[in-house]
Amino acid sequence: MKDKVNVATSTFNHTPVLANELIEIIKKLPEDLIKNCLIIDATIGGGGHSSLVLETFPGISVIGLDQDPKAVAAASEHLKIFGDRAKIETTNFSNFTPSKKVAMVFADLGVSSPQLDEGSRGFSFRLNGPLDMRMNQIDGTNAAELIDRLSENELANLIFKYGEERFSRRIAKRIKHDLAKQGPYSGTIALAYAIAGCYPPKLRNRRVHPATKTFQALRIAINHELDVLSVLLKKAPEWLLDDGLFAVISFHSLEDRLVKKSFLTDTRLERITRKPLIATTNEISINPRSRSAKMRVARRIEAIK
């Protein structure tokens, strides 16, 4: 099987991470389920993982969820060749409940490559765009509104809590000073430049951009990412058939710690991966963003009758 699976539409060009590992995990389902079952792709994005699953397992159907209307449009186009085996809904997974038990729930957390690579979405500190960062650009508070509303202390606490940024106090002070002196930032690059200026000179040119942690913190807060993940971790085991699988790919330590703790303590689940699955050297060379991906998998324990 090829290491690279590329999904391309007019608006989405995304290489799903740990795709081969996902296929191998699905093979752990009972044989009778693989022949005829339903799985939930809780973060369908451009449809890359689901496309590979549907192609590999003719007996499996997928319900795909995403709160990003652009992702839903891309996935719908990409998966239309599978007919009624693929159904897609525009919703956050925390608001969803299936009408029947399913064989697997899968979630690929965080921001997709198309969202990062489209400056107008406001996620990127390398491509200029408005300070937005909302997964669903129709609803909710954007990044510009958030940093304007919070006090310096509240902003520093947010950056430290969700970004684990050691210079959070310095960064928050600079942001609030700039807003008071010159008004809103012109875009993402202006904010990233201000953040970089809060780092000691010797730390500004490392592989990880100085704005990475602050942008992560703002994005997590704006989209309530850890809150909705906690909801999924609580609800998903109830959606599963006995011996059904629950797989989550995370991209930073805050997400991974939540998933790890849930899989360890939830009595409805047993881990089938003691350590997280990570990308191969070959995959990382093809898709550098897979470097930080970790997949944890658990199985639904048979409920006591």
Swiss-Prot record:
Gene3D superfamilies: Putative methyltransferase TM0872, insert domain, Vaccinia Virus protein VP39. InterPro entries: RsmH, SAM-dep_MeTrfase_MraW_recog, SAM-dependent_MTases_sf. It catalyses: cytidine(1402) in 16S rRNA + S-adenosyl-L-methionine = N(4)-methylcytidine(1402) in 16S rRNA + S-adenosyl-L-homocysteine + H(+). It holds the Pfam family Methyltransf_5. S-adenosyl-L-methionine binds at residues 47-49, 66, 93, 108, 115. Its main location: cytoplasm. The keyword rRNA processing applies. One of its GO terms (biological process) is rRNA base methylation. GO terms for cellular component: cytoplasm. It is an enzyme of class 2 (transferase). The keyword Coiled coil does not apply. One of its GO terms (molecular function) is rRNA (cytosine-N4-)-methyltransferase activity. It comes from the Bacteria. SUPFAM superfamilies: Putative methyltransferase TM0872, insert domain, S-adenosyl-L-methionine-dependent methyltransferases. Its EC number is 2.1.1.199. Keywords: Cytoplasm, Methyltransferase, rRNA processing, S-adenosyl-L-methionine, Transferase. It is found in: Cytoplasm. Transmembrane segments: none annotated. Specifically methylates the N4 position of cytidine in position 1402 (C1402) of 16S rRNA. Belongs to the methyltransferase superfamily. RsmH family. This is Ribosomal RNA small subunit methyltransferase H. It comes from Prochlorococcus marinus (strain MIT 9211). The gene is rsmH.
